């Protein structure tokens, strides 16, 4: 049963781009995307604070679900919609502070054991990856493939789930067919020859998410 320890999110979050700049946040919100993540890696809080503030303000303006990757203190300070954490970040994060601030929490997983860890935290949603080989970040684990993804989605039947990792426009329909509630994309949009067209096509497949 879906009873998160954090505020709930819709079962279907729809198309969920993960981007590294405020410029991309603004572009995609303007293109109709309503679930996004700002993921800026390996910089100090004070270096990214202005970007976090700007992204959160844009999210509010468009009434969107904007998650901040990793920088949970800044997300709390500036009242983001939510925070996304990797497995390696869970232990070093004050989950009670995120909960007390009323922020949603998403957690990355790569196998059944990590799903167990995520479920113990009772987050708002669980990300399942990486589905296919990905160039976006170095991954110590092997790609799960569609069959494994479908098994995880079935296990988490009533939990909001997000598929991530190598999800392209061509692969997106098969990923959605597993029953997963959302697809997270990176290069499928940011490296597309025509990002507006790619975004529109992906929105047609994955939707904007439930209210």
Curated annotation (Swiss-Prot):
Pfam families for this protein: TMP-TENI (PF02581)
Keyword Aminoacyl-tRNA synthetase part of the UniProt annotation: no
Residues bound to 4-amino-2-methyl-5-(diphosphooxymethyl)pyrimidine: 37-41, 69, 108, 137
EC number: 2.5.1.3
Entry-linked Gene3D superfamilies: Aldolase class I
Position of the signal peptide: none
Disulfide bonds: none
GO CC terms, sorted: cytoplasm
Identification of the protein by name: Thiamine-phosphate synthase
Organism: Escherichia coli O9:H4 (strain HS)
Gene, per the UniProt record: thiE
């Amino acid at each position: 049963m879906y009873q998160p320890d954090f505020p709930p999110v819709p079962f279907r979050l729809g198309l969920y781009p993960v981007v590294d700049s405020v410029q991309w946040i603004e572009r995609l919100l303007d293109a109709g995307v309503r679930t996004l993540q700002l993921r800026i890696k390996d910089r100090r809080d004070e270096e990214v604070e202005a970007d976090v503030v700007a992204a959160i303000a844009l999210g509010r303006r468009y009434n969107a679900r904007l998650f901040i990757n990793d920088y949970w203190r800044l997300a709390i300070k500036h009242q983001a919609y939510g925070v996304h954490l990797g497995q390696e970040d869970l232990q070093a994060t004050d989950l009670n502070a995120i909960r007390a601030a009323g922020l949603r929490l998403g957690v990355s997983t790569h196998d059944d054991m990590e799903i167990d860890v995520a479920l113990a935290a009772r987050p708002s949603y669980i990300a399942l990856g990486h589905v296919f080989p990905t160039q976006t970040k170095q991954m110590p684990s092997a790609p799960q493939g569609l069959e494994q993804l479908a098994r995880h989605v079935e296990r988490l039947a009533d939990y909001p789930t997000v598929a991530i990792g190598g999800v392209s426009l061509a692969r997106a329909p098969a990923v959605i067919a597993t029953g997963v509630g959302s697809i997270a994309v990176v290069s499928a949009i940011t490296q597309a020859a025509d990002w507006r067209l790619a975004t529109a096509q992906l929105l047609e497949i994955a939707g904007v998410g439930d209210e």
